[in-house]
Amino acid sequence: MPLERTLSIIKPDAVGKHLTGRILARFERAGLQPVAIKMVRLTSEQAEAFYAEHKGREFYQPLIDFMTSGPMVVQVLQAENAINLYREMIGKTDPTQAAAGTIRADFAESTRCNAVHGSDSPASAAKEIAFFFSDDEICPPAAD
């Protein structure tokens, strides 16, 4: 199976609770290798552009407010079947419905403050990765 990339965001709630290292370690233990990583704080304009597909929905403005409330860690993770592996690890959006042992079950507070974001398809991964990273910011994976 070919290598695949996904975008991972450790959201402001998890960064603010000093969970970044614990979450990153889980990804690495699962074989999701970081090939790009940085800490950012989105402006309202950036958050609106990233979440443009949700504009007009009732949760849109609270989502923008939350995603601009503090720093977050964005990264590109690479592995075979990276998107599905990542999504299995993070669990359902609603932490009360997330399986035990998933990141959201362990660290999330609510559907909005749910610790992490992950791409849901190869098309969204490509779009989301390009939003945060230029091609020259993405490194080849480290040798095993």
Swiss-Prot record:
PROSITE patterns, A to Z: NDPK (PS00469), NDPK_LIKE (PS51374)
Positions contributing to ATP binding: 11, 59, 87, 93, 104, 114
Cell compartments where the protein resides: Cytoplasm
UniProt entry keywords in alphabetical sequence: ATP-binding, Cytoplasm, Kinase, Magnesium, Metal-binding, Nucleotide metabolism, Nucleotide-binding, Phosphoprotein, Transferase
GO biological process: CTP biosynthetic process; GTP biosynthetic process; UTP biosynthetic process
EC assignment: 2.7.4.6
Name of the protein described by the UniProt record: Nucleoside diphosphate kinase
Origin species: Psychromonas ingrahamii (strain DSM 17664 / CCUG 51855 / 37)
Top-tier EC class: transferase
Annotated active site: 117 (pros-phosphohistidine intermediate)
InterPro entries reported in the protein's UniProt record: NDK-like_dom, NDK-like_dom_sf, Nucleoside_diP_kinase, Nucleoside_diP_kinase_AS
Gene Ontology, cellular component aspect: cytoplasm
Quaternary structure (record): Homotetramer.
